[in-house]
Amino acid sequence: MEQTTIIPPSYLPMVVEAEQTTNIGETIIDAEIITEDTRSPFIEANSTAITLESLQNDCVIPNFAKDNEAVISHSQFIGATYQALKDFYRNEQIDEPQIRVSHIIRGRIPEAINKKSSELLPHEMTQYYERMAFCINVPTIYQDVNGNRLQLSIVGVKSYGRDNLNGKLTGQKFSIAVGFQNTVCCNQCIWTDGYSDDIRAISPGEIYQHTLRLLDTYDMAKHIYLLQSLGDLYLSETQFALILGKMRLYNYLPQRIQRGIPEMLITDSMVNSVARQYYRDPNFRVTDSGELSMWDFYNLITGACKKGCYIDTFLDRQANALTTSLGIAEGLRDEDSGYSWFIS
């Protein structure tokens, strides 16, 4: 088995010291702006790339209806997470955020209320994006796993649809995951222990603190060990077909049966993508001898998630992809696993 040492391993927990930081909401807004991004996107489906500059300058900020208090903007969320990552890993290289958005909400200023949409001038139109996701990589912390270079990565997701903007200012919901990105394909490797799906915050400073705590508790070495373990097992074509068939069947099971099986969030369209890429994927397709490693199987799922998930479900499905793959691997080892149903 490959060594599980992370290179380099040195970092200092920053939670206590960072609590003394003040005015974090102001300092993080001036994060360096992305001017051009030629990297492969970490999520593709139903989303478009945007720069931090555009988020800051071209988008309005929604308010809570009953007290007119502003929400935490997308750029503030990105800035708080970016600053926490820089402070936690002080001696490492931190890449610029890669940002994706979807579900644009358009509006107009009051003076243009009676104009037709075709008559609106640029300064009379407003917009913001309901959903936003960003990815920040740390390329100096990496590990080679099953022949692929993985680099440390943090992903944040925000959907204003999760907040009650019709009420008064209250804690807003954010999701953050720390894990790895496969540099071969830019698939995210998210583990449930590095994923916080319901962070509540009313200021960028609170997001900053939540991010530091998540980074401090994340067990990087164990995550790498689990990912490496997937390379030790192989699926025959018959086993692969059986598992995909059970995945298709899962969502149609009677509730009494489904309750006895661990949750699976892989959709029918994702299953179709995995089947299609079984022979076609340049990096993770079946070998000439007809075998597919569980590592390759896992990456086919994360690739399908990258190409087929909406922003607001992206992290849930990515984390579930690893949970499901590890569970099936346990079943293949004849261990007591609730996932045995998928291979029997």
Predicted regions and their residues:
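A short acidic/basic microdomain associated with nuclease active sites
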Residues: 88-134
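Intrinsically disordered, low-complexity regions enriched in serine/threonine
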Residues: 1-36, 115-344
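Feature for intrinsically disordered/low-complexity regulatory segments and propeptides
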Residues: 1-82, 86-93, 97-105
